[in-house]
């Protein structure tokens, strides 16, 4: 079947630099703080925090999954781009080789637009269930909205 790709764009009234720093660069700290039931912790297991860094993400009690390994693929602070791939873990269902999320934050008058492309790469000819992709897209949207609400309530945080 091949890879499955989703594209999502979300407008926000939070400034682009704030979204980039809070939502993407500091996700290790902000997500467990804002959504501890979804993600308990994120820790670096190798690397310096830049491209190539591997992180262990321990998921919270609302997730049916437990732990994933995530690799940072790109950090471009000037272009406000960030990408990472999930490369190990039960979330891959034994049929997905990797899930790559690519973010670009685009400044607008009074805020920004966050563009996210997610690529689900199957193992061999495996078919990735459409409902899993839809659920993951919805959950990502909920995480973004929760972090956006935190950033709006704490304008000096980033």
Curated annotation (Swiss-Prot):
The keyword Nucleotide-binding does not apply. SMART domains: Bet_v_1 (SM01037). Keywords: Pathogenesis-related protein, Plant defense. Transmembrane segments: none annotated. CDD domains: Bet_v1-like (cd07816). Pfam families: Bet_v_1 (PF00407). One of its GO terms (molecular function) is abscisic acid binding. GO terms for biological process: abscisic acid-activated signaling pathway; defense response. One of its GO terms (cellular component) is nucleus. InterPro entries: Bet_v_I/MLP, Bet_v_I_allergen, Plant_def-hormone_signal, START-like_dom_sf. Belongs to the BetVI family. This is Pathogenesis-related protein 2.
């Amino acid at each position: 079947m091949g890879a499955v790709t989703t594209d999502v764009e979300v407008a926000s009234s939070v400034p682009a630099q704030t979204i980039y720093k809070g939502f993407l660069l500091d996700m290790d700290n902000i997500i467990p703080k804002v959504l501890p039931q979804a993600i308990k912790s994120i820790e670096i297991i190798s690397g310096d925090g830049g491209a190539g860094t591997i992180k262990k993400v321990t998921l919270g009690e609302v997730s049916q999954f437990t732990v994933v390994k995530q690799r940072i693929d790109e950090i471009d602070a000037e272009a406000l781009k960030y990408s990472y791939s999930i490369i190990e873990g039960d979330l891959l269902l034994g049929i997905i080789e990797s899930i790559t999320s690519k973010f670009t934050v685009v400044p607008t008058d009074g805020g920004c637009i966050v563009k996210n492309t997610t690529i689900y790469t199957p193992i061999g000819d495996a078919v990735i269930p459409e409902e899993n992709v839809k659920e993951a897209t919805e959950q990502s949207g909920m995480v973004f909205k929760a972090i956006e609400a935190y950033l709006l309530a704490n304008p000096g945080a980033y």
